[in-house]
Amino acid sequence: MEKRPLAGKVALVAGGTRGGGRGIAVQLGVAGATVYVSGRSSGSAGSDLGRAETIEETAALVDAAGGTGIAVRADHGDPDQVRALVDRIAADRDGRLDVLVDSVWGGDPLTDWEHPLWEQDLDRGLRLLRRAVETHVITSRFALPLMVARESGLVVEVTDGNTARYRGSFFYDLAKSAVIRLAFAQAAELRPHGVAALAITPGFLRSEAVLDHLGVTEENWRDGAVKDPHFAYSESPAYLGRAVAALAADPDVMAKSGRALATWGLYGEYGFTDVDGTQPDFAAHWADALVDEYGPLGDPL
């Protein structure tokens, strides 16, 4: 891959505040892109998640990586705010948007891992769907016209898992499966206009929240395997980011449109590594250590 294959390209990473979204934004910056980073957690106003990370921090990391980071606070559940965000990009960049990444989530505090549907709080579950699915629909509704007008671009829907395996909680499973279907449906409608759309999942992602939960940092993350042995096979957000940057730089990415992809299925093709030079493959670890307990991952959707 060229050193800066995305120089001159414009990207929007919705939900780029932390985790996979931040990792993707930074790696798009490494590849030379101008990256608009949007979300609710800003230096001027936080979100109900109560996390310390901000969109401004992510934008600064994009700058430090060699790209251009632009933070724009927006609640992607509010159509007016998303419309204003896209209008700003159009005005700033002469209508150009090459990459749309939708990594909006915010569902961790709403996920009930203990109860079946009939025992769950309905309002809480529906709020999860609004955050995790409706936000993606709203974002694409306003951003896609920029790509369609130029007859080029890539839409990336970030999810969890790329198969039909049940994900352990009704509303969580519904949200993550729906995001894959969003990519499939967008691919069908965008194909005549030369725009690709796909879904992508990381493996066991070392997000800030996961690191906090295990009481470690990115510097000593391996110590987290004491509490969770499977964490030894985790991957950093940069690994997901490098996968997306490789896809965005691939002139033949249209061949992957409509598919549900994974970091473990792409590192061999594109040759990217994690920050420590390794190439984590969580599907291989699953087959070795988890399949007897949880069943096979299944074939990609």
Regions found by a protein language model. Give the residues of each.
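A glycine/serine/threonine-rich, flexible loop-to-helix segment
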Residues: G50-R51, H115, P192, F204-H230, ...
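A short helix-coil junction within the Rossmann-fold of NAD(P)-dependent oxidoreductases
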Residues: D92-D94, G107-D112, F142-E151, D250
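Short-chain dehydrogenase/reductase
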Residues: M1-G95, W105-P116, L297, L301
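Catalytic loop of short-chain dehydrogenase/reductase
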Residues: G106-L110, W118-R124, L128, L154-P192, ...
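Amphipathic alpha-helical dimer-interface segment in Rossmann-like NAD(P)H-dependent oxidoreductases
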Residues: W105, R127-A149, T163, A187-A188
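C-terminal helical subdomain
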Residues: A199, E219-L301
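Active-site loop of short-chain dehydrogenase/reductase
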Residues: K9, G67-T68, G95-L97, L146-G161, ...
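Rossmann-fold scaffold of SDR-type NAD(P)-dependent oxidoreductases
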Residues: A14, L97-P109, A132, E157-T159, ...
